[in-house]
């Protein structure tokens, strides 16, 4: 929805999640839209042929390359960055080993090794802090 607003296909909205499926269909020339529960379901529906096309995160296509065709990658200037934040929380029930292991995991996530793993699964790690 945000990409369609930014591309000028839909009118600006304070909350793009409130843009109806009907509005999107009309902006796309009246195509039938099947809104699935989440992007994983959309990806599966396209892969099995229940839907002809779908809009999903690139990372959700991993492992389905032989069953789907990527028609277009929408640029970040239309969508904005998709950020998956991580933080270590204060947990009074965690012992010292659990707390230090959690910190090690968070520290690992910002290493080059972790970036390589994320990139393997189609996550873009070229974002600004």
Question: Language-model segments: which ranges?
Answer:
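Exported/periplasmic ABC-transporter solute-binding proteins
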Residues: 1-129
């Amino acid at each position: 929805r945000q990409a369609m607003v930014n591309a000028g296909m839909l009118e600006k909205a304070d909350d793009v999640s409130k843009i109806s499926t009907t509005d999107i269909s009309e902006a796309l020339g009246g195509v039938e839209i099947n809104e699935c529960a989440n992007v994983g379901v959309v990806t599966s529906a396209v892969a099995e042929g229940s839907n002809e096309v779908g809009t999903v995160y690139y990372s959700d296509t991993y492992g389905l390359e032989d069953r789907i065709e990527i028609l277009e990658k929408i640029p970040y200037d239309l969508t904005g960055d998709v950020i998956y934040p991580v933080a270590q929380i204060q947990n009074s029930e965690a012992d010292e080993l659990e707390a230090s292991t959690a910190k090690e995991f968070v520290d690992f996530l910002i290493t080059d090794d972790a970036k390589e793993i994320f990139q393997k699964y189609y996550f873009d790690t070229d974002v600004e802090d």
